[in-house]
Amino acid sequence: MTKPSVDPSVASRLNRRRFLKSSTVAAGTFLLGAPAFLRGKGLNEKLNIAIIGAGGRGAANTQSVSSENIVVLCDVSENNLNQAAEKYPKARKYVDFRKLYDKAKDIDAVVVSTAEHTHAFATLPAIQLGKHVYCEKPLTHGIREARFIAEAAKKAKVTTQMGTQMHARDNFRRVVELIRTGSIGPVREAHVWVSRAWGWQTPEEARINKDIVSVLERPRQAMPVPAGLHWDLFLGPAPERPFHDVYWPGPKWYRWWDFGSGTMSDLGSHWNDLPFWALNLRHPLTIESKGPPPHPEIAPASMSAAYEYGARGDLPPVNVTWYQGTVKPPHYVEKKIPQWDNGVLFVGDKGMLLADYGKHVLLPEANFRDFKGPDPFIPRVRGHHEEWIEACKTGKPTGSNFDYAGALTEANHLGNLAYRLGKKLEWDPVNLRARNCPEADRLIGKRYREGWSL
């Protein structure tokens, strides 16, 4: 490979100009569209926030927005609810998030950390009422849901953020700057892998892969519902089934198609975010996934998904491949790169860039010893939640807003869709359909239990 010939100073100026131009337009849109009750709200004024999902990730998210006023707590588990209420005793308490929206006048913003299959249901009423929303990843449980929620947020002009905290880290932003300024030349392929192997597997495989549960089939026997858990509310729009501890508490539910979407959409929300952002991706042309024979109810522990993306402006077509569990990219298997457990590898005409959450390296290192990267041009932020809170008050754009995050969520779900159908899909993003696979329609949209609708 030849030494990169890019002029960092020129590239930095050009990309900074493009970035600031697009950011200014976006910021103007958000400022003009900010709900009236927050226009001109000072940074020192606190938001009134409703917490939907107070345990697990919800507890962490609550702590991350605790600089504001926590006025509502909601969780299907009374134990989680009461534990959170010890810290926020003045907050109103609910077990059914649908009811809190009946008395929402004092709420400025909502943080949603429920199980994946109820994300859209907890988020949509907030958007329709003009509340700002922070939602855990993945944004929704399905492809059509993701598009619907993203469009609703755009129409309502509310400030949104999906919970992909790595998007706010300096390392991710630096990688995007390096890729966009041509540090390794045009990128024509990228590989993303995570070592987590949770899902359909034997007890022995689960032990080796450090999975907290082993699931091969839906349990036939029921178990007593834990005290304080409102199981029917946890099920929400999902088909009715008796309680068993292979479903709850989280993150056990994420292995089951009725409640989650496996590692592909969970960790894929974090790791696929980096190539999605750096390569300016949106909708793939085709998707083809490989793995063990699909189970009708349980997500796989290991699989891969290959995406073909077309040219984007002056960027060439690119192939992006996802690997999870025991499956790894060829560069890793052949030991041509450092053996990181998780990573993103960009392969360019002039070199490669390997990154994870906290670090990155240009390869081969000998070619980049004297390399000086571009000056930073993507604004740094104090944190993912902090960025959202500030945006709620000022109208500034957020990095993982629902327009961006919705498209990322769609792409991740498409990997699962191709896997479950066992076909290479030709994707029509306008009509949300696979041109060559009409049977995909049943999985692109969703059927909800009686009493639940969007």
Which residue ranges define each predicted feature?
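Glycine-enriched catalytic-core subsegment of oxygenase/oxidase enzymes
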Residues: 60, 66-67, 74, 78-80, ...
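Predominantly a Rossmann-like dinucleotide-binding segment in NAD(P)-dependent oxidoreductases
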Residues: 53-57, 61, 161, 166-288, ...
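Beta-strand-loop-alpha-helix segment that lines the small-molecule cofactor/substrate pocket
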Residues: 116, 120-168, 175, 182
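N-terminal Rossmann-like dinucleotide-binding module
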Residues: 23-88, 166-169, 275
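Short amphipathic alpha-helix with an adjacent loop that forms part of the alpha/beta core around
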Residues: 99-105
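Conserved SAM-binding strand-loop segment of SAM-dependent methyltransferases
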Residues: 92-96
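N-terminal Rossmann-like NAD(P) cofactor-binding module of classical short-chain dehydrogenase/reductase
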Residues: 110-111
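N-terminal secretory signal peptides and thylakoid transit peptides that target proteins
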Residues: 6-27
